A protein has these predicted regions:
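Nucleotide-activated chemistry modules centered on ATP-dependent adenylation/adenylyltransferase
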Residues: 1-140
Length: 140
């Protein structure tokens, strides 16, 4: 899509690592997944591994980048959110559905049962299709 920012996850991970360094935190968590790879090379595991190595070398400490969604389909990600139930008094599924944002065109005005966005970009289409599949399988 036109709004795709090449290498954005390199920027996010570098920024997070700099912030974490000053707090003596060595574990970073990212929501990247290879299901997003079609057109998004910075969502691949090989990229994340290279960033883990580069950040560790740049900061002279062992940094670990955890990507719990890496090998899940979008439907499985919705299922995971549902299965997590409540955390710290918050319904994880509802928090993901309402507060997370996937639309690459920044649309937050159109509400759908899968969250905010329009189906005019690949990211929203993947999210909506995953939601539909999870619903059809009775996971959510």
């Amino acid at each position: 899509p036109a709004s795709f920012v090449p290498g954005r996850n390199a920027l996010f991970l570098s920024t997070a690592a700099s912030y974490a360094y000053n707090r003596d935190v060595q574990d970073l968590v990212g929501g990247m997944c290879q299901t997003d790879y079609s057109g998004y090379p910075d969502c691949r595991r090989v990229f994340i591994d290279s960033m883990e190595t580069s950040i560790s070398l740049a900061m002279d400490m062992d940094v670990r980048i955890h990507t719990p969604l890496m090998y899940l389909t979008k439907a499985e990600t919705w299922k995971l959110a549902k299965d997590l139930g409540e955390v710290a008094g918050q319904d994880v599924f509802e928090t993901v559905r309402i507060e997370s944002h996937t639309d690459y065109n920044g649309n937050r005005s159109q509400w759908n049962e899968w969250g905010y966005g329009k189906l005019d970009n690949p990211a929203s289409k993947l999210r909506a299709e995953g939601y539909k599949e999870a619903k059809e399988k009775g996971w959510i």
